[in-house]
Regions:
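Surface-exposed coil/turn segments at beta-strand junctions on protein surfaces, enriched
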Residues: 55, 71, 101, 113-115, ...
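Surface-exposed beta-strand/loop patches in extracellular or lumenal glycoproteins
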Residues: 63-84, 155, 163-170
Length: 176
């Protein structure tokens, strides 16, 4: 009987779902994570709002709605290359939710998503790594793999998205 139990345990461990692949949780975006997201996520839209203070020593605050369709309810992994304390609030489909922040990823559990349309809202403090801030202006060149240093997103080129950006800036500034 012990032999049967051992064999069953081995079989169960061999049948782990793709989300149990530890490489998808590595820093950066592993090939496994990129392939998993490409298969499961579509109709991706970002609605990003950034509040940029005049003083460059003050943080840039932001909020983002990440909207997408899933082929099935599952764990969702967003990229954010910042410290965990920069994440202020997370909700999924209109409800406050728990999440894990690990290795530059915001990990939302399966029970927070649904097959079909999903809306993830995150309030955060933007990272400064890719923001070039001067006394009179701010600009950024978000070359590949740098968007996640400013705001949470799915940072991979094969996931195309529509994008809206709203800027709250000092009245004497002009956004171009």
């Amino acid at each position: 009987h012990y032999g049967i139990i051992i064999i069953m345990c081995c079989l169960l461990n061999a049948c782990q779902p793709a989300s149990q692949n530890p490489r998808i949780y590595d820093s950066g975006i592993s090939q496994e994570l990129a392939e998993l997201r490409k298969q499961e996520i579509n109709e991706l839209k970002y609605d990003l709002r950034l509040s940029i203070p005049k003083q460059k020593s003050m943080p840039v605050e932001g909020e983002i709605h990440v909207r997408f369709r899933l082929n099935k309810a599952q764990e969702v992994i967003l990229d954010f290359r910042e410290e965990a304390d920069k994440i202020k609030e997370v909700s999924a489909n209109g409800l406050p939710t728990s999440y894990e922040f690990r290795n530059e990823h915001i990990i939302l559990p399966k029970n927070t998503t649904q097959k079909g349309e999903n809306d993830i809202y995150i309030r955060f403090t933007a990272g400064n790594q890719s923001l070039n801030r001067n006394d009179e202006f701010l600009y950024t060149l978000l070359v590949p793999d740098r968007a996640r240093t400013v705001f949470p997103c799915f940072e991979q080129p094969n996931l195309k998205a529509s994008f809206t950006l709203q800027l709250d800036i000092p009245s004497e500034w002009v956004a171009v």
